[in-house]
A protein has these predicted regions:
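C-terminal substrate-binding/catalytic lobe of Rossmann-fold NAD(P)-dependent oxidoreductases
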Residues: 2, 10-39, 121-174
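Hydrophobic beta-strand scaffold residues
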Residues: 26, 68-69, 92-93
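Short, ordered loop/turn segments at secondary-structure junctions
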Residues: 32, 73-75, 98-99, 130-132
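Beta-loop-alpha module in the N-terminal Rossmann-like domain of NAD(P)-dependent dehydrogenases
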Residues: 37-61, 74-79
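Rossmann-fold NAD(P)-binding glycine/threonine-rich loop
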Residues: 59, 63, 72-95, 101-115
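Active-site-proximal catalytic alpha-helix in oxidoreductases
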Residues: 101-117, 135-148
């Protein structure tokens, strides 16, 4: 498979290493220096850039009929527009706040526990998230997914609040 990588930081380089080891070919590596480069010749694009660049990269891939896998978070407030474009273009887009199998199992357990918490109004959910200082998006898509799932599964909650303590420590609580 021929892959276009949008975002060539730590994650992009890790994806490239695994892809090449499995016999795939990386035909494009997009960084800030060559932003806006079309995914010509790619079978699929993998998007792990920054929230401000992700939407432009998704648009570019959809405009060139290249399916795109998106791991970048921080753009979900524009989800309706992205869904519309995918539908209008009859394109393909797969996104997740976290692609780790372990974290997705954790998401499932979180939803189960949120359902159990619904019977315990004397308890409240609270999420503290701490990352390394190089984390580009905070709070992470993972923390937002956890909070959203608790909100959806538990009566009595009507959303969640983001509290920023500092750049490396983000709190999501209710």
């Amino acid at each position: 498979m021929k892959i276009a990588l949008y975002g060539y930081g730590k994650m992009g380089k890790a994806i490239e290493a695994v892809a090449v080891a499995r016999g795939h070919e990386v035909v494009l590596r997009v960084t800030g220096a060559n932003a806006g480069t079309a995914p010509t010749g790619a079978d699929v694009a993998i998007e792990f850039s920054t929230p401000d660049q992700a939407l432009a990269n998704m648009d570019l891939c959809l405009d060139h009929d290249v399916p795109v896998v998106v791991g970048t978070t921080g753009w979900y407030d524009k989800m309706n527009g992205v869904r519309k474009k995918v539908g209008d273009k009859k394109g393909s887009l797969l996104w997740a706040s976290n692609f780790s199998i372990g974290v997705n199992l954790f998401f499932r357990v979180n939803r189960m526990l949120a359902g159990l918490m619904d019977t315990r109004p004397d308890y409240a959910a609270h999420i503290d998230e701490i990352h390394h200082i190089h984390k580009l998006d905070a709070p992470s898509g993972t923390a937002i997914t956890l909070a959203r799932d608790i909100d959806l599964k538990t009566k009595g909650y009507s959303g969640f609040e983001l509290k920023e303590d500092n750049a490396a420590d983000q709190t999501i609580s209710r």
